[in-house]
Amino acid sequence: MFLGLGRFSRLVLWFAAFRKLLGHHGLASAKFLWCLCLLSVMSLPQQVWTLPYKIGVVGPWACDSLFSKALPEVAARLAIERINRDPSFDLSYSFEYVILNEDCQTSRALSSFISHHQMASGFIGPTNPGYCEAASLLGNSWDKGIFSWACVNYELDNKISYPTFSRTLPSPIRVLVTVMKYFQWAHAGVISSDEDIWVHTANRVASALRSHGLPVGVVLTTGQDSQSMRKALQRIHQADRIRIIIMCMHSALIGGETQMHLLECAHDLKMTDGTYVFVPYDALLYSLPYKHTPYRVLRNNPKLREAYDAVLTITVESQEKTFYQAFTEAAARGEIPEKLEFDQVSPLFGTIYNSIYFIAQAMNNAMKENGQAGAASLVQHSRNMQFHGFNQLMRTDSNGNGISEYVILDTNLKEWELHSTYTVDMEMELLRFGGTPIHFPGGRPPRADAKCWFAEGKICHGGIDPAFAMMVCLTLLIALLSINGFAYFIRRRINKIQLIKGPNRILLTLEDVTFINPHFGSKRGSRASVSFQITSEVQSGRSPRLSFSSGSLTPATYENSNIAIYEGDWVWLKKFSLGDFGDLKSIKSRASDVFEMMKDLRHENINPLLGFFYDSGMFAIVTEFCSRGSLEDILTNQDVKLDWMFKSSLLLDLIKGMKYLHHREFVHGRLKSRNCVVDGRFVLKVTDYGFNDILEMLRLSEEESSMEELLWTAPELLRAPRGSRLGSFAGDVYSFAIIMQEVMVRGTPFCMMDLPAQEIINRLKKPPPVYRPVVPPEHAPPECLQLMKQCWAEAAEQRPTFDEIFNQFKTFNKGKKTNIIDSMLRMLEQYSSNLEDLIRERTEELEIEKQKTEKLLTQMLPPSVAESLKKGCTVEPEGFDLVTLYFSDIVGFTTISAMSEPIEVVDLLNDLYTLFDAIIGSHDVYKVETIGDAYMVASGLPKRNGSRHAAEIANMSLDILSSVGTFKMRHMPEVPVRIRIGLHSGPVVAGVVGLTMPRYCLFGDTVNTASRMESTGLPYRIHVSLSTVTILQNLSEGYEVELRGRTELKGKGTEETFWLIGKKGFMKPLPVPPPVDKDGQVGHGLQPVEIAAFQRRKAERQLVRNKP
């Protein structure tokens, strides 16, 4: 694009035009017209006969207050005026500027940039790296130069793809890499504030560092709250080997609150102890003043000053004068409005100024070279430039990018000024020591990383040679595989030997067991006339059902008996009579695998697997024999009396056994009352676990179960294909719920529904409605019924685990252990004549004590909180938007205590607080606590009451003040008891604090303000804040208040406060406040007259006592 041809070229055009006039008019008139035109042209100002070049300064000036502090309008005007006055620039064109606002959201920022197409001839910007590449491509398309100091995108260095883009400052990444290389800090973390511009900056910084081969561990964004900052810093702390943390946000030194709070949070987490170095990214974009420049934020914030000891500030060196000095000089010359103070301006002002000069110098070079100022030509002629910027000498390299010298600034714990330590030479890309060492926390910098991270053309693996690392890993892998293979071979060999030999053999034959006729001999008790007729539905997974008959003395064989003696103990054999089991060698190999999986299952409530029996074509599982039979047998035997303690003991045994199985990652899959056996000590044990694994071991397919057998199966398993019903953890919980129903009603599953099993199964498969047993409430405690319903929930994920079931079940018995023997003894004692009376009497006493305990608890805590604590629930902190707080104390309490005996002080407080407690009972208020003579009451919590809280507290305060007016101390009746009262309304957070003697406490600024209202009040006065007065006036209930005036509240400044002096319809007398002295003050203790009267009376009493 051609913007001008020079003054001489324009004059040539004028001459050509007037030569044509000579051909059409007379000589005299032509000469006259020629002179007139020549004089007119020469008298025109420069701006008329030169072409303008308008520079658009793009940035988030309207939506970011800290960017707007750079005063882009003032900086651009100052630069443009100086350029247009500078005779060294080509005068064939003039410069203008326009301030273009960039939206703080990236998508909108790009859209607004496109709309700026016709508004400028070239652009300084963008400021947001999120759309720098898109803006550069648009600039190329528009043939308009893009000159940016903020685009960190390393892709823009490609001049072929982006010929119209140029940096007015060195790439911040080059500066960072130079510093990181010098200190050997390779591992970096990047954290940004949550504004779009900084989030994109952080991502581009991380990408650029990674393009240099440096490991960036984390790239995080933090919010403004401390919780978000703490979480982000903890993630950095957990990341591996991070040395340097780059903070992409506004610097705390120029008003960036996010960075200030972030550093304070890092200080609290002890991350500023020298483990990490923090680098503010934005300081790389401008020249931060440091010579004789104290920073108030460091002086006023000791925590930040300590944290800043771990910060290295890298900024553009101000070689000639500081930014503030240059700004002050320009203001003194009238170039900048006088009302602007230099410390209110961001140093980014100088960067904007320098960028405009950058474009002007490039334009000047292009026009002198070839008279053309296209965008690509401007970028090309910005190479190897040198000009004076706002407060330093500016140069460019052979690529047209700015070259500036940088300085590393540091501080220490004693100062709030920054001082120079190193300079960063960007031409040589090295650091030069400036004479003052860096003060690192702990006396030394963070640990250095391996040098290979900064070696070009070399892949770094944390300092370990890749070939060596691969060789070590391969050697270790081969060794580990060899050891595991050898160990596995030895173990398999030992297991095979143990299968049939030695004391731990698991594959038994007829030589190892002796089948017996199932009658009890002397070992099991005198039951010679009883024998067992035992049937076993093995393939269906059904455990033995025991029936009794007399006189059965048939000889026992493996064919007609399931009971045998093995090593002196009775065992039960669960037979598998179907299928082709193969030869003994095949059985050995498969039995070893399954037994290895099941042999370690040892628990009091698990029936242990003793081995496998294989002989004469029969295979069986060998387990301990339980003489009481299955749980189903006990439930159907009406001769066995079961109270709830007995039932809960059996259920608890079942829970313990299943909990153990699930902890070992074992799914039962066939849990039912028939698979729960009870031994002679009435201990329930779970059996038939691992049934599916045994079927697989024997290569048997599962036979279809009868409908009655499926009543314990979970609905989701019923809907599954028959071959895939291998069970699940949630399915076992459902089966347990059905067993609970059996135990509660002493009946079969779904016995109360009076439907055939086929119909029940169909309804279970196809809800809605959800079909479950109905258990009357009188059969079990409500808590137990509720647990049962949770366990058979339709959604499997909603069912509790056995750990949760165990924890709930323990609470049903108040933590007492269930014991079958104790239960039987208690059943026998119930026949005693006085047992019922004794139980009733004890129950009544327990209920009375319970009521006393609950009453005491509700006096200490709010009823709702107390109820939650009784249920074992956690009381979460609760926020209240608006409550009213009451604080009062006794005026002169210290003096009264000094003149009284300790017991008299206790009596005084007890009498006074008893009076107060009686008064607050008639108001909707909650007594929070008493500490010494301080009395604290709240309304609006824990039960919310709308806007009534202010009225309730005000009414209570008037009642208390009235009652105190007539209150007399027993030991000092002549000394009046004066109180001062403070009221304030606002938000609070309430919660229970502590485990031992828990307290219901209030937190928030409202509590502090209410306390300040009391402490700045006067005797016999109710001191009320503006917030409370506003609520009382809105209620329109006739409260009478008078303005006290502006009152100094500690930590709050001066606020307008009021006195509450009464209420329409309140007829009780109020005490007269003491008079105010001539200085407007009143005594905050006892008056000398009152003290003297008391001492005189005390002396008289002492004299009376001493008389004989």
Swiss-Prot record:
It is a single-pass type I membrane protein. Residues 532-812 form the Protein kinase domain. It catalyses: GTP = 3',5'-cyclic GMP + diphosphate. Its EC number is 4.6.1.2. It is found in: Photoreceptor outer segment membrane. The chain crosses the membrane at residues 468-490. Disulfide bonds join 104-132. Residues 491-1108 are cytoplasmic. There are 9 conserved cysteine residues in sensory guanylate cyclases, 6 in the extracellular domain, which may be involved in intra- or interchain disulfide bonds. Retina. Localized exclusively in the outer nuclear layer and inner segments of the rod and cone photoreceptor cells. Residues 884-1014 form the Guanylate cyclase domain. Activated by GUCA1B when free calcium ions concentration is low, and inhibited by GUCA1B when free calcium ions concentration is high. Inhibited by RD3. Residues 51-467 are extracellular. Keywords: Cell projection, cGMP biosynthesis, Disulfide bond, GTP-binding, Lyase, Membrane, Nucleotide-binding, Sensory transduction, Signal, Transmembrane, Transmembrane helix, Vision. SMART domains: CYCc. Residues 1-50 form the signal peptide. One of its GO terms (cellular component) is plasma membrane. One of its GO terms (biological process) is visual perception. Changing residue 1052 to R: In a lung adenocarcinoma sample; somatic mutation. GO terms for molecular function: ATP binding; GTP binding; guanylate cyclase activity; identical protein binding; peptide receptor activity; protein kinase activity; protein-containing complex binding; signaling receptor activity. Homodimer. Interacts with RD3; promotes the exit of GUCY2F from the endoplasmic reticulum and its trafficking to the photoreceptor outer segments. Responsible for the synthesis of cyclic GMP (cGMP) in rods and cones of photoreceptors. Plays an essential role in phototransduction, by mediating cGMP replenishment. May also participate in the trafficking of membrane-asociated proteins to the photoreceptor outer segment membrane. The protein kinase domain is predicted to be catalytically inactive. Belongs to the adenylyl cyclase class-4/guanylyl cyclase family. This is Retinal guanylyl cyclase 2. The gene is GUCY2F.
